[in-house]
Design a protein with these regions (language model features):
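Metzincin-family zinc-dependent endopeptidase catalytic domain
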Residues: 1-92, 103
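The catalytic-center signature of Zn2+-dependent metalloproteases
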Residues: 75-144
Length: 144
C-alpha cells in the first residue's frame, strides 16, 4: 500500500495526480523489477479525466490503482469487502494488461474493457477474453 502521496496533491481538483504517482513509482522501483503495482486509498485523476480507478504506463513497468472509488461506500452502499477486492483484482489485471501493451477491448466482459463507471467494472470478469489472453501471452513472451 502506498503511503499518502502528498507530492501528487492537486489543490484545484482536490484529488491526486496519477501521473505524478506513476513517475515516483518509476523512479523508486528496482531496475530488476518486472512490474510494480502501487495501491492507494486516495482519489486519483488524469488531467483529461475527472477520475481514474487505476493507470499504467502502456508497455511500461509501473501501474497504480486506487481503492477510493472501488469501495461500495463511495456510492452510498454498505461496506462489502469481497466486492471491493473483486473490483481491485479486476482493476489490477486491467492495468497489468496495459503494462504489457494491451489496449482497451470492446467485449464488455473482458477485463480490458474500459471502465467509465463502476458498473462497467462490476460487469467484467476477472479474466481476459480469448483474444486479449492470446495478445497478453504474445506480448509477455516478447518482453521476457
Amino acid at each position: 500500500m502506498l503511503e499518502n502521496p502528498a507530492y501528487a496533491w492537486d489543490s484545484q481538483r482536490d484529488q491526486y495526480c496519477c501521473r505524478r504517482v506513476l513517475q515516483r513509482l518509476e523512479r523508486s522501483c528496482s531496475p530488476s523489477s518486472w512490474r510494480v503495482l502501487g495501491v492507494t486509498e486516495v482519489d486519483l485523476f488524469m488531467p483529461i479525466l475527472k477520475y481514474v480507478y487505476g493507470a499504467s504506463q502502456l508497455a511500461g513497468r509501473c501501474a497504480v490503482i486506487s481503492l477510493h472509488r472501488l469501495r461500495p461506500q463511495y456510492y452510498g452502499d454498505k461496506e462489502n469487502e469481497p466486492l471491493l477486492w473483486e473490483r481491485a483484482v479486476k482493476t489490477a489485471l486491467h492495468e497489468l494488461g496495459h503494462s504489457v501493451g494491451l489496449t482497451h477491448c470492446r467485449r464488455r466482459q473482458c477485463v480490458m474493457y474500459s471502465s467509465w463507471r463502476i458498473q462497467d467494472t462490476d460487469a467484467k470478469l476477472a479474466d481476459f477474453c480469448p483474444t486479449c489472453r492470446e495478445l497478453f501471452k504474445w506480448n509477455l513472451e516478447k518482453r521476457l
